[in-house]
């Protein structure tokens, strides 16, 4: 842990998957995220924490650098028709691309029918106990936050780490951080998983941390994306079409490009290559806006009309 010019801290990152998703990724084009690269190349190099000798600490990620706590989506409660398959593709891609540097630890979802008080819209201030009770579906993520807390505390207590980095804004983790502070000399870092400067980290977590990263930028998320195609033992994991910035614009362009190029892989290769006929822009980037998509579609339709039998769209 010692050394000239500051300590070298054996570091592990603990990611609260759903807290991270809802804080940083929901509705964004950054869901196909390489969590290991995000922390290794973006987050940790930005952290300046002074050790006892008033020299900056160095962050050295352990071989298992990231523990990612999540739960498999229940199909009956999924919000999208491809939610289950997309999550599975992402988890498989993470495990294969990060090759042992990232561990996925899963809890589970509980889906049950319960009775709960209904808000009285005629009198919103009416106490819940006085409101009508109705039957509802209750969705609960189970064990993820408990497992994160236990893993972080275990790793700190057994001397596996010199620094734990918690990527969550869930105050349920405060007792675990308190125990780490009370019973070990391990450094506690906090990363608030939000891109919104107006959503500050919870005070109770900040007070228990040696340092805090208050937000993650979109630039950092963009710089830490997995490749569109990730090889696995049998086959590949593909970034879901619905995880791009504008799937509604990408889908028709992909259909046209596949028609000409012959396969979806070849179509994506064309869409990912700067095109001189589109002023050097990458078609895939243009498909993030209505105006850009119109330019791409118009170009492809014109090209197809002029070259009906060719598969080598320029």
Task: State the predicted function of each range.
Residues 109-245:
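Nuclease catalytic cores that cleave nucleic-acid phosphodiester bonds
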């Amino acid at each position: 842990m010692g050394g000239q010019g500051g300590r070298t801290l054996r570091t592990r990152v603990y990611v609260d998957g759903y807290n991270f998703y809802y804080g940083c990724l929901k509705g964004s084009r950054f869901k196909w995220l390489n969590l290991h690269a995000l922390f290794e190349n973006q987050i940790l190099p930005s952290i300046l924490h002074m050790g006892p000798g008033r020299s900056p600490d160095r962050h050295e990620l352990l071989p298992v650098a990231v523990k990612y706590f999540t739960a498999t989506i229940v199909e009956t409660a999924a919000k999208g028709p491809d939610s289950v398959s997309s999550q599975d593709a992402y988890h498989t891609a993470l495990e294969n691309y990060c090759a042992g540097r990232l561990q996925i630890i899963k809890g589970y979802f509980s889906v049950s029918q319960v009775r709960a008080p209904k808000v009285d819209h005629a009198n919103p201030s009416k106490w819940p106990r006085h409101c009508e009770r109705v039957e509802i579906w209750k969705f609960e993520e189970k064990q993820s936050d408990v497992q994160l807390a236990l893993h972080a505390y275990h790793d700190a207590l057994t001397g596996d780490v010199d620094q734990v980095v918690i990527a969550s804004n869930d105050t349920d983790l405060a007792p675990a951080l308190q125990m780490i502070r009370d019973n070990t000399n391990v450094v506690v870092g906090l990363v608030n998983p939000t891109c919104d400067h107006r959503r500050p980290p919870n005070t109770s977590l900040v007070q228990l941390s040696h340092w805090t990263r208050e937000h993650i930028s979109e630039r950092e998320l963009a710089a830490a994306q997995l490749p569109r195609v990730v090889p696995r033992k049998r086959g590949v994991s593909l970034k879901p079409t619905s995880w791009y910035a504008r799937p509604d614009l990408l889908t028709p362009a992909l259909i046209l490009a596949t028609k000409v190029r012959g396969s979806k892989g070849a179509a994506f290769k064309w869409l990912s290559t700067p095109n001189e006929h589109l002023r050097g822009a990458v078609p895939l980037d243009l498909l993030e806006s209505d105006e850009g998509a119109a330019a791409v579609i118009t170009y492809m339709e014109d090209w197809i009309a002029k070259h009906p039998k060719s598969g080598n769209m320029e």
